Amino acid sequence: MEILLYTGLGVGLIFASEIGGYIWHRYGAHTDILPFVKDTHQVHHTRIHDQAHGDFFYIAILLVLYLAFLFYLYYLTYISLVLLTILYLGVFFPFIWSYYIHSAYHITDHWLNDYEWFQNDKRIHFKHHEDPTKNYGIATHFTDELLGTFDYAFPINKNIEK
């Protein structure tokens, strides 16, 4: 029974991470709530080969703070190390996946360009660069579909294939 609980928690955290990434991208990187983040992100939108390392740097800082919070929680409550690990990895791995996929979108000769699913995701991503009110998802777009910001229309810039 414990394995089901931990599995459910891990899957839930993956979904929560994706929703958190959407919120960060939509409201952190595209509004004036955090102007320094918006400024960094706008540079990314104007350079096709900019991999947005600055944006991900801020998120990496949040991951370190989250880990510190979990250890503090562990210290206060003595929750199991298994649970602590799931709570961290369920957020950490989706971040790493998003970072990798997003960087690959901006690398001309990336090996993933050989796959149609990646080419489609890349088009969706670059559509966001043309219309910053659409397609906030990075590695998945279920949150965009859920919240009405998904647009599959291909971007005008056809120079993104490879």
Predicted regions and their residues:
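Alpha-helical transmembrane segments of multipass membrane proteins
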Residues: L67-Y72
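Short hydrophobic alpha-helical membrane-embedded segments
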Residues: Y58-V64
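Cytosolic/stromal cytosol-facing helical appendages immediately following the last transmembrane segment
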Residues: E2-G8, G12-Y58, L73-Y78, L83-L84, ...
